[in-house]
């Protein structure tokens, strides 16, 4: 477990943040929401895939801890990213969120490494049911679960279709 940065060591940009843990690769998803709130990092494991990010100043609330909205957004990216990796039925498809639940368990301080792992609980012809656990420097900070519709195919290659080791 790494110590969070002290207030006199602010992390205001990704250039000032410590490196991602070993084995994590930066993923880029073009423009839009993920580009503004990322970068996100992924690492393959025997069980599936881990997704993570470093808490920067732009992710925090006035108490200098990761805003709950950012953790919810992270959960809403973690679950379908994992589904794209684990489920052939999801590869290359848009997975709109039908339902997302999050239980906040602790806080993720500025500078902490947040990562999550998820699993598929059930797969039907039209939906994927998932759950995941999010940690900050090894401490459980959120439990997430969601239901995602197996939507239309993306046109052309899509970066979430399959994790490409890099």
Q: What are the language-model segments listed below?
A:
Residues 1-166:
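Terminal targeting signals and extreme-terminal segments of soluble enzymes
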């Amino acid at each position: 477990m790494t110590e969070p940065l002290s207030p006199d060591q602010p992390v205001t940009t990704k250039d000032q943040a410590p490196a991602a843990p070993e084995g994590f690769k930066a993923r880029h998803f073009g423009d839009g929401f993920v580009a503004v709130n990322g970068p996100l990092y992924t690492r393959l494991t025997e069980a599936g895939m881990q997704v993570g990010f470093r808490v920067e100043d732009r992710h925090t609330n006035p108490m200098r801890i990761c805003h709950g909205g950012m953790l919810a957004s992270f959960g809403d990216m973690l679950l379908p990213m994992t589904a794209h990796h684990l489920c052939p039925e999801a590869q290359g498809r848009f997975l709109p969120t039908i339902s997302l639940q999050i239980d906040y368990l602790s806080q993720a301080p500025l500078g902490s490494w947040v990562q999550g792992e998820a699993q598929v609980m059930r797969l039907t012809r039209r939906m994927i049911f998932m759950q995941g656990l999010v940690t900050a420097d090894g401490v459980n900070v959120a439990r997430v679960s969601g239901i995602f519709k197996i939507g239309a195919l993306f046109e052309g290659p899509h970066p979430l279709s399959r994790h490409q080791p890099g």
